[in-house]
């Protein structure tokens, strides 16, 4: 199902409550829109007149424009009581999900436009910007009036835009090279003690691990991967990290082996991997700049097929809630895809009494799945795994999108006009 938007979308976020079927979208026009897709889960005859007469399985709850600059990120907090948004004018704004009114504002939160926002818990929120600065905030303490926003802490170890952030409630400590008893005891104590960490990927080709309790010294930065790191997800209950790159290679990281360098690599995508979502503990969904959403199995590595297609337009963002995946590309629509056929019963916490939603099923995309994972026809005899193309350095899709490799750039140049 496609949700029609008033302009091109840059980010999307599901309401965290399982009983609330709402999704927020940040637009290039500066608008933030909230949609209710609950009609997909109920008989159409029980729906309000608006959704029944329109023939749509969704309705727009509200639309606001807190800034005239593009909204580059949206994210609900864990309780769903706040919708945090970042804008090109360098501000952070908290909206009330009930009606969209502004609850709090952090003006001039960054020196350059923020590119990512991640609410961690009610007392902590992280943002990253186009210059590679990561900042931590207390959402409960916005500045008064038009006062300049002051972060709890600021990190400047990255030199290029922040592409993605992942919060790990526990990250395994690296294994000691010395197998003596003292090291084993120390590692055991570390494993028993919560090691929450913020994992950050950047366009400068490095991955960093931030201990928010460790001050400036609580930062570890990987070696230069000689490729832009664009997205990140965790599998194996946090034992492995998957990172998408500009060259289309998935780099695999093992925290217990240290995060100074990747532990494995899996080529196979003909274009950059701009978005990642965990499907289960062995499988991820990848959103690529060729417009395809692929299912990728890891350990052993295998491209399983395609579950979505944005018509050749790059996929900017993917978010998952239960058996639904929301994806946005370079267009004025948000696609909702039903993943229920891919998920075994009991893998996803959903209401058993609810019928299957009337969204695009994987079976409806049989003509896509029949193609190999790189988008070619299987009858051609080509392997699912392709070698990555020659390295080409791209600039950020948010602030430096001018050099990003997409199809028919000239025809879609207006997408980047207000970024």
Swiss-Prot record:
What do the Gene Ontology cellular component annotations say? nucleolus
**Record key words, sorted:** Nucleus, Repeat, WD repeat
Spell out the residue ranges making up region: Disordered.
172-192, 372-408
Subcellular location, record wording: Nucleus, Nucleolus
Each WD repeat, start to end: 4-45, 66-105, 108-147, 180-220, 224-263, 268-308, 351-390
Q: Where is the composition biased (Basic residues)?
A: 392-404
Q: Which domain of life is it from?
A: Eukaryota
Any matching Pfam family: WD40
InterPro entries in UniProt: WD40/YVTN_repeat-like_dom_sf, WD40_repeat_dom_sf, WD40_rpt, WDR55_POC1
Q: Does the UniProt entry include the keyword Repeat? A: yes
Q: Main localisation, per the record?
A: nucleus
Q: Which family does it belong to?
A: Belongs to the WD repeat WDR55 family.
Q: What name appears for this protein in its UniProt entry?
A: WD repeat-containing protein JIP5
Gene name of this polypeptide: JIP5
